[in-house]
UniProtKB/Swiss-Prot annotation:
The keyword Metal-binding applies. The lineage of its organism: Viruses, Duplodnaviria, Heunggongvirae, Peploviricota, Herviviricetes. SUPFAM superfamilies: RING/U-box (SSF57850). It is an enzyme of class 2 (transferase). Residues 206-391, 406-426, 461-498, 510-532 are annotated as: Disordered. Its EC number is 2.3.2.27. This is E3 ubiquitin-protein ligase ICP0. InterPro entries: Znf_C3HC4_RING-type, Znf_RING, Znf_RING/FYVE/PHD, Znf_RING_CS.
Length: 532
């Protein structure tokens, strides 16, 4: 017999259930060699067809041999059908020629270390064994041991009923016959339900004929020919090209015979996207000049009048200010005059790119007093039958009024005194921000220096909520200030005692106690030192 191999060539571990393949006598694990032979009945090392497997070797005369009934011949043309046919015959309904090829010992694999099946196809058999052995034995530990014994017996004897009955009789006694019968049925179902297919054997190096290689190269050159997408005519077509020129020349004549349709021009942008504004006529210009807004009631002022308001903040798209900005002013319901942009241009003496955009929010009365709320104030320069007049003033006068209306802090206004421009009760009202673009060539350009913007008023919580869609944010988390130590000078005696106690503890931890002097015996005896 051959010597025992140090490691299995398949799993590279110490061989369990030492086995050898005949006739080459190469040593493997029993599980590894049986799995290998089911896929390819040749030796993994020397590629010699395996005739039998010797396993459970106790001595030179005591061992077990399992024969491989497949006669594998490399030179024959039926080498694939001879081994594959015995495993695929189960699907066709015919019994295989050698039944030990699919229900013999090589069809079963021992359990893994964790108690699961060694092969996925045997897992239903292991599940059945778990249920059946739990019914026959009392403890789960004993059932686990019997499960391993049953699977090892199947790996050695296969579905041999006589041998299984003889092996299981000392353990199952009167339950041996029904258990073996059910075990064989379950084992054959698991093995026969999934026939084992062999791995395709390699044919080695295949040499290609030179004639076939030349033909393939010609096909590759034909496929590499570039095709001009502009010239897709048939190369065999020999028709004259003049016919195509004549047909192309006649094409525009046929198109000219059709009635011409007016093509729509590019869309123009109006005030609303996707709609074309109608051409303004003389009546529409006059109506735009005298257009007035409908009066709106203000619940805060209860219908009282506070002064004249001229709104000149309309942009080119016709959008007005947000409702929250205008609603924050304590104003009255006055008609608003929208000036005509076409006639306002020639009124300015100087025309330049930097035109003056005036945002006149309110106007001060000569006495700097508010009119009574019960008496409405008529607009300046307008009467019942007359057309309202535009306020005409110089740029310097407007600058003075604008700075008087600008928002400022109450502390700054009080410190400045009444000598400052616009000092009065109306100077501290919250007004919206206004930006004035001044013509540099006009009068008073040096006062502004180009662009002039006042401080932006901070929005209130209600205004911010309306801008977010009436969604209120939860208040921010405020940091808690550190709690100081209790004051000794407090009137409460409990607080004074606690503060004094805290300071005493701090003083005690900061000072270190003095080390006591070591008492020594004059004779330096260890007994005296130990007693101390």
């Amino acid at each position: 017999m051959a010597t025992v191999a140090e490691r299995c060539p398949i799993c590279l571990e110490d061989p369990s259930n030492y086995s050898m393949a005949l006739p080459c006598l190469h040593a493997f694990c029993y599980v590894c060699i049986t799995r290998w032979i089911r896929q390819n009945p040749t030796c993994p090392l020397c590629k010699v067809p395996v005739e039998s497997v010797v396993h459970t070797i106790e001595s030179d005369s005591e061992f077990k041999e399992t024969k491989v009934s497949v006669d594998f011949d490399y030179d024959s043309e039926e080498d694939e059908d001879s081994f594959e046919g015995q495993f695929l015959a189960v699907d066709s309904g015919d019994a295989p020629a050698n039944i030990s090829a699919w229900n013999g010992p090589m069809a079963f694999v021992p359990l893994n270390a964790n108690g699961t099946a060694g092969a996925p196809r045997l897992q239903p058999l292991v599940d059945w064994l778990v249920e059946r052995l739990d019914q026959l034995f009392e403890t789960p530990e004993l059932a686990l041991v019997m499960r391993n014994i049953v699977m090892d017996t199947l790996c050695e004897h296969g579905c041999n009923e006589e041998e299984l009955t003889r092996q299981f009789w000392p353990m199952f006694h009167e339950d041996t016959v029904p258990f073996v019968t059910d075990l064989i049925v379950q084992a054959e179902l698991c093995v026969a339900s999934r026939p084992i297919l062999p791995i395709a054997r390699g044919r080695g190096v295949e040499y290609i004929d030179s004639s076939s290689s030349s033909s393939s190269s010609e096909e590759e050159t034909d496929s590499d020919i570039e095709v001009d997408p502009n010239n897709l005519t048939d190369p065999e077509d020999t028709s004259d090209e003049t016919s195509t020129d004549n047909s192309s020349a006649q094409a525009p004549r046929q198109e000219d015979s059709r009635p011409a349709r007016a093509r729509p021009g590019p869309p123009t942008r109006g005030r609303r996207r996707g709609r074309r504004p109608a051409a303004p006529g003389p009546a529409s210009r006059r109506s735009a000049r005298l257009r007035r807004r409908q009066p709106r009631t203000n619940s805060r002022t209860n219908g009282g009048d506070n002064g004249e308001i001229i709104d000149l903040t309309l942009d080119s798209d016709g959008d007005t200010e947000p409702a929250d900005v205008s609603g924050s002013l304590n104003t009255t319901d006055q008609p608003v005059l929208i000036p005509d942009e076409e006639e306002a241009a020639p009124a300015s003496p100087h025309t330049s790119s930097n035109s003056a955009i005036i945002c006149l929010v309110s106007e001060l009365t000569p006495e700097s007093e508010e009119p009574p709320r019960d008496q409405p104030v008529a607009p300046s320069g307008s009467s019942a039958g007359e057309r309202p007049m535009r306020p005409r003033c110089s740029l310097r006068e407007f600058a003075r009024r604008f700075m008087a209306l600008a928002p400022r802090d109450s502390s700054t206004s009080e410190a400045a005194g009444p000598s400052r421009l616009g000092a009065g009760p109306r100077a501290t009202e919250p007004f919206s921000v206004a930006v004035v673009l001044v013509d540099r060539s006009s009068e008073g350009a040096g006062l502004f220096g180009g662009r002039f913007a006042q401080h932006v008023r901070r929005r209130t919580e209600d205004e911010s909520a309306r801008r977010r869609g009436n969604v209120l944010l939860r208040p921010r988390r405020q940091s808690v200030p550190p709690v100081p130590y209790p004051d000794i000078a407090s009137t409460s005696p409990l607080i004074r005692q606690g503060g004094q106690r805290v300071r005493d503890l701090q003083r005690a931890f900061q000072t270190q106690p003095a080390e006591p002097e070591e008492m020594r015996c004059p004779h330096n005896c260890q007994r005296y030192r130990r007693n101390q």
